[in-house]
């Protein structure tokens, strides 16, 4: 019996919507990354993007444990001299709540073209509204 290898043109991708209200950031991000890679499917193949599309709503209501709300720092650089910036988790939630989940999930995906293709299937929204109703996403309870 030969080993099954998925082909990009035969992969069936579903759309799922996940509510992040009250979910722990890391535990949510690991499950999202797993589903974006397609590791939950029997036909998973490491070098083929077999993952599903994931819509995350209520990103502003994601939770962290302990003192991470004030202690967890996000760093970035503006590209200008002396342009290193940082913000706490609380500041990031106030400024751009989608980025918190996006950064967490992106770090858990493979680096390179395949990982970027997987990351593009993640859609994160701060509130409870999203504009993907035409795709008829199924509710995914994580």
Curated annotation (Swiss-Prot):
Domain of life: Bacteria
Disulphide connectivity of cysteines: none
One GO process term, biological-process aspect: negative regulation of translation
CDD domains, alphabetized: Ribosomal_L13
One annotated GO molecular function: structural constituent of ribosome
Role description: This protein is one of the early assembly proteins of the 50S ribosomal subunit, although it is not seen to bind rRNA by itself. It is important during the early stages of 50S assembly.
NCBIfam families xref list: rplM_bact (TIGR01066)
Family stated for the protein in its record: Belongs to the universal ribosomal protein uL13 family.
Quaternary assembly: Part of the 50S ribosomal subunit.
Protein known as: Large ribosomal subunit protein uL13
Lineage: Bacteria, Pseudomonadati, Pseudomonadota, Gammaproteobacteria, Pasteurellales
